């Protein structure tokens, strides 16, 4: 069974060599000539790069650092990486620029960014879920640098997973050995048995919290953007990974299924591009209609109000009688 490059990267670099002749690039001629697809994809990536770049700048220089904004900053960096590498790959394949080194690094860093985004979204969901289930611990016992440490560990995990996928399954350094199969199994377990279930379960709890509105002072906007971002990721970004995994284990997929891969890749770039828009729109929502600057909207949406009625109650509850 031929290894099929997994995770995010699409038809441009990872599709098996069907419809391929020495005079063609990795895409079939049908997709290479599809200038509409190329232009739309490039516009999406360009807007996403601008939006995430602006978000990164605001989070670093203009908005006070908080536990939640640390996660959002790292997520924006991961999305920026995916969009940049996707843009490079589209330009390389459209203009027939043959550069294996550039292509290899673009694939590696895009897989790296995709995996990191998945891990960070799960961490964000789990942490907010814990703030709902254990509000006193979150206010009083949560380690000060937990967000930064968690982000570093998740980046390290992504380096491991992405490096294994790239080394054994994409570059095929040792194609005569079955390591790629084990890498796929490890990646599938990590994704579909650990991170995705945690993400979904945590967001179900947040959804119940928002619907029941048991504690009015809870940062509802924060929960809304978390749930929206996760739903967008599951709808737009996950189908690519699922299809490529199925393609690795099934040699009987119809060509029409492979033809959908470039469009699934476009959906994944939409997912990376739309997050800053979600933050701004949710941050701008207000009962009183008033225009807000981008900075004010972001500050509003990233506010973390106390999750209990008052600090006195927390102190009274936590001190021995």
Curated annotation (Swiss-Prot):
GO molecular function, one term: G protein-coupled receptor activity
Extracellular side: 1-35, 93-102, 169-188, 247
KW Iron (keyword) present: no
Transmembrane segments: 36-56, 72-92, 103-126, 148-168, 189-209, 226-246, 248-271
Membrane topology: Multi-pass membrane protein
Glycan-linked positions: 23, 99
Record gene name: Mrgprh
Any one GO cellular component localisation term in the record: plasma membrane
Keyword set, alphabetical order: Cell membrane, G-protein coupled receptor, Glycoprotein, Membrane, Receptor, Transducer, Transmembrane, Transmembrane helix
Native source organism of the sequence: Mus musculus
Record's subcellular location: Cell membrane
Top-level taxonomic group: Eukaryota
Ranges in the topological domain labelled Cytoplasmic: 57-71, 127-147, 210-225, 272-320
PROSITE patterns: G_PROTEIN_RECEP_F1_1, G_PROTEIN_RECEP_F1_2
Family listed: Belongs to the G-protein coupled receptor 1 family. Mas subfamily.
Protein name per UniProt: Mas-related G-protein coupled receptor member H
General function of this protein: Orphan receptor. May regulate nociceptor function and/or development, including the sensation or modulation of pain.
Pfam families the UniProt entry points to: 7tm_1
